[in-house]
């Protein structure tokens, strides 16, 4: 079930959309430069967000207040009238450590502190550590504006026959779902190393739907 949960997180961020029989990921939508041919006629007007909501900030020489001011300005691209909910910020542990390093300071008593404990300071919003994300990339926004639909409940099955000789029990978990950001402008992808944001992510082969496999 944990593996399925990580797969869902990865699909929400980087899913390739209906053409690949997958949910449409936040970063994938932000990176679009033209409206897809199957874009729904009754959906809100398609907007090109690949420059306004995919951003590069920071770099080796940017620290302290200057860095946090840049981050605050970049996260402001998530402006929307459609949510008053909490924000989230997904990143890997190296990026989390880099953010923490930019907060290190000495107290009056000589103690070293870095006040970053699961929530992004100043910007606000919970931090979700996902190790499949590239170093330096942060993806986030208003999570309640991503529509996720379970097409079928999660099932977990087991079999002893498939590796009977090895005396192993094999477990198989599966779930079917769809989703897409309903207000894409409520999300942003940022790289804090002043390099390009990764917009394409590899997924394991789909043995259920690909006739070539």
Regions of interest found by a model, annotated:
Residues 1-73, 191-213:
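Alpha-helical scaffold segments that mediate packing/assembly in large oligomeric complexes
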Residues 33-34, 103-108, 188:
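Short secondary-structure boundary/capping segments
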Residues 99-101, 150, 181-183, 187:
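Short acidic, gly/pro-rich beta-turn/loop elements at beta-sheet edges
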Residues 84-132:
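C-terminal structural cap/anchor segments
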Residues 118-161:
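C-terminal hydrophobic structural anchor segments
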Residues 1-41, 79-96, 154-183:
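Long, contiguous amphipathic alpha-helices that act as assembly "spine/axial" helices in icosahedral shell
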Residues 67-72, 104-108, 152-154:
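Flexible, glycine/threonine-enriched loop-and-boundary segments that flank and lead into catalytic domains
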Residues 162-213:
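Hydrophobic, glycine-enriched assembly/anchoring segments
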């Amino acid at each position: 079930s944990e593996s399925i949960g990580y797969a869902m997180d990865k699909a929400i961020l980087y899913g390739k959309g209906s053409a690949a029989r997958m949910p449409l990921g936040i970063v994938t939508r932000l990176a679009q430069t033209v409206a897809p041919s199957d874009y729904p006629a009754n959906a809100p007007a398609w907007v090109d967000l690949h420059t306004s909501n995919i951003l590069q900030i920071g770099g080796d020489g940017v620290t302290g207040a200057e860095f946090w001011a840049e981050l605050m300005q970049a996260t402001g691209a998530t402006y929307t009238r459609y949510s008053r909910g909490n924000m989230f910020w997904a990143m890997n542990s190296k990026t989390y450590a880099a953010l923490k390093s930019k907060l290190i300071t000495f107290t009056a008593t000589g103690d070293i502190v870095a006040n970053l404990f699961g929530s992004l300071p100043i910007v606000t919003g919970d931090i979700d550590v996902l190790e499949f994300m590239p170093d330096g990339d942060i993806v986030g926004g208003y999570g309640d504006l991503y529509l996720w639909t379970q097409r079928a409940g999660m099932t977990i099955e087991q079999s002893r026959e498939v590796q009977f000789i090895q005396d192993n029990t094999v477990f198989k978990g599966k779930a079917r779902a769809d989703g897409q950001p309903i207000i894409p402008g409520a999300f942003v992808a940022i790289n804090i190393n002043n390099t390009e944001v990764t917009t394409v992510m590899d997924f394991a082969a789909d043995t259920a739907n690909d006739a070539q496999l």
